[in-house]
Structures are given as C-alpha cells and as structure tokens.
C-alpha cells in the first residue's frame, strides 16, 4: 500500500564541480511546463539561475537534457500534458510527512537525497498525533536516503511514504528537482484563495 519507486542512476562525470559552482548562491524557481514547449520552457526557466560561465559548459546542456527526459517520463506516468516544476537549493521539510498529492517525483542532483522510512519501521500513530521525528522513527538504523541522480516517485496521501529533508540538506545547500501533477498547484491556489475570503 505504501508505494515508492526508485530508479537508480550513476552520477555523471563533471556533475560535482558544476553543481558546487551553481550552489554558491541559493535559488528556487518554479513554473508550469507543458509537453508542447517543454524543452524551450525548461531552458527559459532554468536560465534565471545559471551564471554565464556555467551556461556555456557542455555539462549544462547535458543536465538540461536530463531534466527534460525526466519531465517527459513523469508526463507519461501522470497521463497529463502539463506538470508543476520546482528546482531549488533550500529544503525545509524537517518533520517526517506524506505529500498531499497522488504521486511526486524527486531527483536530488547535488547534496544528500531525501530521507525516508519503510512503513514497518515507522510509528504511524506517533506521526498522526504530531509527535516529533524521534517518536516516529522506531529504529534509526532503518533510515533510507535517495542517492544523488536517482529518480524517486513517492505515493502521497494517507498511504504515502513518510519522508523528510535530511539534516545535511537542512543545514547546507543541495539541489532538488520536484515534479507534481498540475492539479496540485490548482488545489494549493484554491486553498489559499479560501483562506483569504
């Protein structure tokens, strides 16, 4: 019931030095991407945070192509023509939680990947009661971390995988790409409008 899929990949050569330079300044970008203009829209969005000395490198084009491929894969999985895209260095999910979405795709390109636990290693009642992480995790030796460049798709909702931002990413920079179905953005916007009224 508590589903997750993780596709393991090797970190390509040149990634470490490229992202080390990119992470010198914090950033966060988001937008809606469509299958029709995906390559162009993605490039325009990412250009906002890429220094000139990095945008001319071969690895930059490799990274853009990788993000495009992952985005197109998620569009097929979700059977939709658009998706919500987020890319940033700041991750602030300290407490274990589940995402309020059917599925979410995560790729950590630099830094430590998302921390997660199997359901049998978690106290779901403690989680539902709002207890701290120490009460939610039954055994710290059972913690899992998504490796850099691996593609993770987590089921959300009440049967979602419990996960959080690891301490290393809370206290230092990393680069995470997050993809959601466009209905997620609509639901968040609707809830914000309701709060204002």
Name the predicted role of every residue range:
Residues 15-85:
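A glycine-rich, hydrophobic loop/mini-helix early in the fold
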Residues 90-148:
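Catalytic core of non-heme Fe(II) oxygenases with the double-stranded beta-helix
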Residues 88-91, 157-159:
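Short beta->alpha connector loops
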Residues 86-87, 95, 109-119, 181-183, ...:
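Active-site environment of non-heme Fe oxygenases that use a 2-His-1-carboxylate facial triad
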Residues 5, 104, 173-177:
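Short beta-strand micro-motifs in enzyme catalytic cores
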Residues 1-2:
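Short, small-residue-biased leader/transition segments that mark boundaries at the very start
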Residues 8, 12:
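Gly/serine-rich nucleotide phosphate-binding loop at the start of the catalytic core
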Residues 136-197:
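Catalytic core of Fe(II)/2-oxoglutarate
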């Amino acid at each position: 019931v508590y589903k997750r899929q993780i596709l393991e990949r090797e970190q390509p050569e040149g990634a470490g030095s490229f992202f080390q330079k990119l992470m010198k300044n914090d950033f966060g970008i988001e937008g809606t991407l469509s299958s029709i203009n995906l390559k162009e829209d993605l490039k325009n969005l990412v250009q906002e945070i890429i220094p000139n000395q990095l945008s001319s490198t071969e690895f930059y084009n490799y990274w853009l192509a990788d993000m495009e491929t992952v985005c197109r894969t998620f569009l097929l999985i979700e059977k939709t023509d658009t998706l919500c895209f987020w890319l940033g260095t700041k991750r602030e999910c300290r407490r274990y939680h589940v995402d309020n979405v059917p599925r979410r795709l995560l790729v950590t390109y630099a830094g430590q990947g998302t921390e997660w636990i199997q359901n049998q290693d978690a106290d779901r009642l403690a989680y539902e009661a709002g207890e701290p992480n120490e009460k939610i995790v039954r055994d710290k030796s059972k913690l899992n971390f998504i490796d850099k460049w691996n593609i993770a798709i987590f089921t959300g909702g009440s049967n979602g995988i419990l996960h959080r931002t690891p301490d290393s990413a809370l206290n230092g920079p990393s680069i995470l790409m997050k993809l959601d179905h466009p209905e997620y953005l609509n639901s968040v916007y609707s809830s914000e409008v309701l709060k204002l009224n």
